[in-house]
Amino acid sequence: MKPLGDRIVIEVVETEEKTASGIVLPDTAKEKPQEGRVVAVGAGRVLDNGQRIAPEVEVGDRIIFSKYAGTEVKYDGKEYLILRESDILAVIR
């Protein structure tokens, strides 16, 4: 899958299903995940003058993104999130 423009495809890292004390959390009580791993990167955004700005993330980077960002898609039996580079808040090094 190759994203277009400044879009990034990520695989979401799921949150823990148990609390530290061992209580199992139902899906309705879980926080929406905000961490993922970059699996594909678009070519970057194009400025008004035609210059292309390359994305700051690379395939394999672990990232933190905005809570309600992106579009969920299913591809080859796996679930991914496609979001814009501006929705990425940080890269975890």
UniProtKB/Swiss-Prot annotation:
Q: What keywords would UniProt list here?
A: Chaperone, Cytoplasm
| Top-level taxonomic group | Bacteria
**The keyword Chaperone belongs to this UniProt entry's keyword annotation:** yes
User: What's in the GO CC field?
Assistant: cytoplasm
A GO MF annotation of the entry reads: metal ion binding
Family matches, as SUPFAM superfamilies: GroES-like
One GO term under biological process is: chaperone cofactor-dependent protein refolding
Q: Mind telling me which SMART domains this protein's record contains?
A: Cpn10
Q: Where in the cell is it found?
A: Cytoplasm
Q: Does the keyword DNA-binding apply?
A: no
What's the chief localization of this chain?
Answer: cytoplasm
Which proteins does it associate with, and in what oligomeric form?
Heptamer of 7 subunits arranged in a ring. Interacts with the chaperonin GroEL.
What does this chain do? Together with the chaperonin GroEL, plays an essential role in assisting protein folding. The GroEL-GroES system forms a nano-cage that allows encapsulation of the non-native substrate proteins and provides a physical environment optimized to promote and accelerate protein folding. GroES binds to the apical surface of the GroEL ring, thereby capping the opening of the GroEL channel.
What family is this? Belongs to the GroES chaperonin family.
This chain's protein is named Co-chaperonin GroES
What are the leading ranks of the lineage? Bacteria, Bacillati, Bacillota, Bacilli, Bacillales
